UniProtKB/Swiss-Prot annotation:
<dbReference type="InterPro" id="IPR003960">
    <property type="entry name" value="ATPase_AAA_CS"/>
</dbReference>
<dbReference type="InterPro" id="IPR003593">
    <property type="entry name" value="AAA+_ATPase"/>
</dbReference>
<keyword id="KW-0378">Hydrolase</keyword>
<keyword id="KW-0472">Membrane</keyword>
<protein>
    <recommendedName>
        <fullName>ATP-dependent zinc metalloprotease FtsH 1</fullName>
        <ecNumber>3.4.24.-</ecNumber>
    </recommendedName>
</protein>
<dbReference type="Pfam" id="PF06480">
    <property type="entry name" value="FtsH_ext"/>
</dbReference>
<feature type="transmembrane region" description="Helical">
    <location>
        <begin position="106"/>
        <end position="126"/>
    </location>
</feature>
<dbReference type="Pfam" id="PF01434">
    <property type="entry name" value="Peptidase_M41"/>
</dbReference>
<dbReference type="InterPro" id="IPR041569">
    <property type="entry name" value="AAA_lid_3"/>
</dbReference>
<comment type="function">
    <text>Acts as a processive, ATP-dependent zinc metallopeptidase for both cytoplasmic and membrane proteins. Plays a role in the quality control of integral membrane proteins.</text>
</comment>
<dbReference type="GO" id="GO:0005524">
    <property type="term" value="F:ATP binding"/>
</dbReference>
<keyword id="KW-0862">Zinc</keyword>
<feature type="compositionally biased region" description="Pro residues">
    <location>
        <begin position="611"/>
        <end position="620"/>
    </location>
</feature>
<dbReference type="InterPro" id="IPR027417">
    <property type="entry name" value="P-loop_NTPase"/>
</dbReference>
<comment type="subunit">
    <text>Homohexamer.</text>
</comment>
<keyword id="KW-1003">Cell membrane</keyword>
<dbReference type="Pfam" id="PF17862">
    <property type="entry name" value="AAA_lid_3"/>
</dbReference>
């Protein structure tokens, strides 16, 4: 019901109802049967008229009848017939009176004024609606910045973990706002702007909120997209209004989230030099450069895309200081987990540092989601504390999504998936530079039918050519296992091939790791599709070089593929034995996998109650019947195994 009162239909309904009552007030309808002039003449001739009032204004005759007693009627008459009417009344000896211009003045005034008053009232109502808030029509030129209330819950630097360098830089901002004379005495000038940049989920907005909670000065928060509208000049007007508010409340802080929405490199796109976004950027440049030292206004901005920002925005005098907020290392992840587990009941055996080691590449948002998922799982099962089981399942949910235990797979597809995943695991296990295998499963998660997770033992910032080669070989281990065991390949390796081809292309064209082509970069980096500085780029190499690049990419991929096949051919017995165990057990953990590879039996690894898997001989590929072709999976998804890729996170092969 509240939605109806706020909708546009409500004022329209009010106007219709008021107009109806006004019409009824001005022209009230008669009740009873119609009384016409001929009926009046009949009553007059029969002597049934008791009295009459002749109203010259409106040409109406008010008649009072004898029977029914004192019943009154109004009837119109022709003005030219007035004298004749009066004569008839005199002849019939009817008492009558004549009313001239006398009338109800208030009613006449209301007749003319009421419609106008209704229109004025409706117009005022509309104006109040469109001017009521920052998002209304008549407020286009006003800034949409939200001022942080003093009474709102505060976030301090104590709530920020894993970004010590960024906290140190921003802590200096707080000190300047609290005690500017300390810096001015040494002739220091505080940075007018601080740009926070880094991957999504690393805590850039959280840092800005912490500054707001610590500084104790007015804090204005706005998004870059709030400046851009379809109307010309709105963005520039909002920028001016924002800085006017800031100057009136100095010292203060302005925080602009996702500044790349308005600060993109000028000249990009199809808008030309008079693009509305560019006019907004020009006004922002003028306002930032127009600061005076006494204003004590500091602007903090956050973005995931510093590479597309206009150089004029990043020059000294505007954003003097640029702070990188990167993914936390193991120590940082441990501190972040301590923050997010604060106040949550954890089991005694949980080791936060060990948990941080299991989450390489996780951002602060990922870790917060991990802990929340674990808490939800514990509550779902009726536990009173969060155990290691829920935390490990939370890691898997963040990486690959929830389990799909109800997904129905045929026995043939399940067998192919198991051998595919075991191919990844065995190749990764026997290669020196591949990341250790952490978990293997044929239980689907998300859109994948199975997965193999490999985790680095420590955070890595550089990768060698040998490590890239081993990683590609491990990625192709699933396809190699299908070829060796089944003599056939499936669509499950489609994403494997995509990842391997991309890595080989980077090695040749970006990293200079091709012995034939040498240390040289070819072409432009296409990994940033939103740069927008150029719609198309031309290759800076000849067709002959392009052919050599293709040959090198093919050679690198085939080398990795052959390496995977050689390893699996040598360890074919382990591939068959452990894959059959995986089909039966569905999931094999790291320690169990390593024990099985070392030659231990299933009973020794899983317990005495386990029986060895049945020895089911695999028929040659030429003797197996072919099933009816099935629809191909969507591009990039696994057809027979999990081929999910999360950059900077544990590898799923």
């Amino acid at each position: 019901m509240s939605r109806f009162f706020k909708s546009a239909a409500f004022p329209i309904l009010i106007v219709v109802v008021l107009a109806f009552f006004a019409q009824r007030l001005i022209n009230p309808g008669d009740s009873g049967p119609r009384y016409d002039y001929s009926t009046f003449q009949q009553d007059l001739s029969e002597g049934n008229v008791k009295s009459a009032v002749v109203k010259t204004k409106g040409n109406l005759l008010e008649v009072t009848l004898k029977s029914p007693a004192n019943q009154k009627h109004e009837v119109g008459y022709v003005p030219d017939n007035g004298n004749t009417l009066v004569g008839q009344l005199e002849r019939e000896r009817v008492a009558f009176d004549i009313e001239g211009t006398k009338s109800n003045g208030w009613l006449s005034l209301l007749t003319y004024v009421l419609p106008f008053l209704i229109f004025i009232g409706f117009w005022i109502f509309l104006m109040n609606q469109v001017q009521g808030g920052g998002s209304k029509v008549m407020s286009f030129g006003k800034s949409r910045a939200r001022r942080l209330s003093v009474d709102s819950p505060k976030i301090t630097f104590r709530d920020v973990a894993g970004a010590d360098e960024a906290v140190e830089e921003l802590h200096e901002i707080k000190e300047f706002l609290e005690n500017p004379k300390k810096f001015q005495a040494l002739g220091a000038r505080i940075p007018k702007g601080v740009l926070l940049y880094g991957p999504p989920g690393t805590g850039k907005t959280l840092l800005a909120r912490a500054v707001a909670g610590e500084a104790g000065v007015p804090f204005f928060s706005i998004s870059g997209s709030d400046f851009v509208e379809m109307f010309v000049g709105v963005g520039a007007s909002r920028v001016r209004d924002l800085f006017e508010q800031a100057k009136q409340n100095a010292p203060c802080i302005i925080f602009m989230d996702e500044i790349d929405a308005v600060g993109r490199h000028r000249g990009a796109g199809m808008g030309g030099g008079h693009d509305e976004r560019e006019q907004t950027l020009n006004q922002l440049l003028v306002e930032m450069d127009g600061f005076e030292a006494k204003d004590n206004i500091i602007m903090i901005a956050a973005t995931n895309r510093p590479d597309i920002l206009d150089p004029a925005l990043l020059r000294p005098g505007r954003f003097d200081r640029q702070v990188t907020v990167d993914r936390p290392d193991r120590k940082g992840r441990s501190k972040i987990l301590e923050v997010h587990t604060r106040g949550k009941p954890l089991a005694r055996e949980i080791d936060i540092d060990a948990l941080a080691g299991q989450t390489p590449g996780f951002t602060g948002a990922d870790l917060a989601n991990l802990v929340n998922e674990a808490a939800l799982l514990a509550a779902r099962t009726g536990k009173r504390e969060i155990t290691q089981v829920e935390l490990e399942e939370g890691i898997m949910r963040v990486i690959a999504g929830p389990e799909k235990k109800t997904r129905v797979m045929s026995s043939e597809e399940r067998r192919i998936t198991a051998y595919h995943e075991m191919g990844h695991a065995l190749v990764g296990h026997f290669l020196e530079h591949a990341d250790p295998v952490h978990k293997i499963s044929v239980i689907g998660r998300g859109q994948a039918l199975g997965y193999t997770i490999s985790m680095p033992q420590e955070d890595k910032f550089l990768t060698t050519r040998a490590a890239l080669g081993d990683t590609m070989a491990m990625t192709l281990g699933g396809r190699a296992a299908e070829e060796i065991i089944f003599g056939e390949i499936t669509t499950g390796a489609s994403n494997d091939l995509e990842k391997v081809t991309g890595t080989a292309k980077q090695m040749v064209m970006r990293f200079g790791m091709s012995e034939k082509l040498g240390p040289r970069v070819f072409g432009h980096d296409q990994s940033q599709p939103f740069l927008g500085r150029e719609f198309s780029s031309q290759a800076d190499y000849s067709d002959e070089i392009a052919r050599e690049i293709d040959d090198e990419i093919r050679r690198i991929v085939e080398t990795a593929h052959q390496s995977a096949k050689d390893i699996l051919t040598e360890h074919r017995e382990s591939l068959v034995y452990i894959s059959e165990i995986l089909i039966k057990r569905e999931t094999i953990e790291k320690d169990q996998f390593e024990a099985l590879v070392d030659g231990r039996t299933e009973e020794e690894v899983f317990g005495a109650e386990a029986s060895p898997p049945p020895d089911v001989p695999l028929p040659p590929a030429t003797e197996r019947g072919r099933d009816t072709p099935r629809p191909l999976p969507r591009p990039g998804l696994a057809g027979g195994a999990a081929e999910m890729h999360f950059p900077e996170r544990p590898e799923l092969a």
